[in-house]
Amino acid sequence: MDLTNMGIAAKDAAFHLATASTAQKNKALAIIADELEANAATILEANAKDIELGREAGLTDALLDRLLLNEERLTGIANDVRNVISLNDPVGSEIDSKALENGMSLSRRRVPLGVVGVIYEARPNVTIDIAALCLKTGNASILRGGKETFFSNMELVKVIQSALEKAELPAASVQYIEKPDRELVSQLLKLDDYVDMIIPRGGAGLHKMCKENSTIPVIIGGFGISHIFVDESADLEKSVDVVENSKVQRPSACNSLDTLLVHEAVAEAFLAKLTQRLAGKVTLVADARAKSLLAGFEDQRDAVEGDFDTEWLSYTLGVKVVADVAEAIDHMRVHNASHSDAIMTNSLESSERFINSVGSAAVYVNASTRFTDGAQFGLGAEVAVSTQKLHARGPMGLEELTSYKWVGKANYLVRG
């Protein structure tokens, strides 16, 4: 597989996409959504092969859940594409403008990034999410999914490229690296003549490899330990609801709860309520102070070194008792709080201190960490959740897939 030729084709496609009308891009997206549902049987059959091979390879239940497609999830993916159609196209919009003293009208206008390379693991829905958002913003994309999703992705890419042809857009607008060879990933990371941005979606190892080997700007996202701190002023009953939702709704998601921090003044009462709710569902990994309050809760073990640095992605939850909001914040600073973190409190002082001190991409007061999601934020599906500070942060929707150019208009103006 010649990635240089793929890069050349992608750059050419990006040139044409940059001037495609919103109507033409939306037409392609509408066809993708319809074809996903029309080809559901074929797509689900391919996904079943991936699931079977995953089980044979000993993948965890959490990974298999990420891999799984069913009719409900496929319909949801199609509807996410339709939602992207309904969103405003940012390309060509003016960010701001001003009139200069010399008579020039100067503005910043949104433009596509160009070619986006995305490397991701066992989530076939990512293939559609990325293709849809890149198409809407006039970007070409080169995708490389994990070997665990090979058969699913092959069928999904067929749907995408068929839709592109029907909408009279370049088929190379969305390309897929079919071979699982890691050497091809290394080659992709060096295609700086053709690719403008790399987005890795996966674990810490993938992010580290991309940062260390890429000659292309890399957006780091997805990985991070998510925390909830239950303050002494919190409504304990409602806090139990939020903690349960953050942990149990979809534990394999990157915004699911990893570590629970509880103020010592309410730890005994709160953990008693929480353990009743989580019994039979979640394994607690407790520090010494929390352990002393968990007598009688069967599914628990002592926390060891590294546990509070673990993104569980499963029905496991770290628990620690802290003295106050300051200790909670200090713990989070040490243990990679960069994704989604929340405080349960009725204290304005505590909430503002938490918001201003915690360095995460998304910070919540009295809300679940599960809200860090493009659709939940009204952005449509996202290509990633960025946990860095440049070029984008948090869920990356349409605007985050654009750059801008300066546009100056004048009456044959010359510089004096």
Curated annotation (Swiss-Prot):
Reaction it catalyzes: L-glutamate 5-semialdehyde + phosphate + NADP(+) = L-glutamyl 5-phosphate + NADPH + H(+)
One Gene Ontology cellular component: cytoplasm
One of the record's GO molecular function terms: glutamate-5-semialdehyde dehydrogenase activity
Entry keyword Ribosomal protein: no
Subcellular location: Cytoplasm
Pathway(s): Amino-acid biosynthesis; L-proline biosynthesis; L-glutamate 5-semialdehyde from L-glutamate: step 2/2
Annotated HAMAP family: ProA (MF_00412)
Protein name (Swiss-Prot/TrEMBL): Gamma-glutamyl phosphate reductase
Gene this protein is translated from: proA
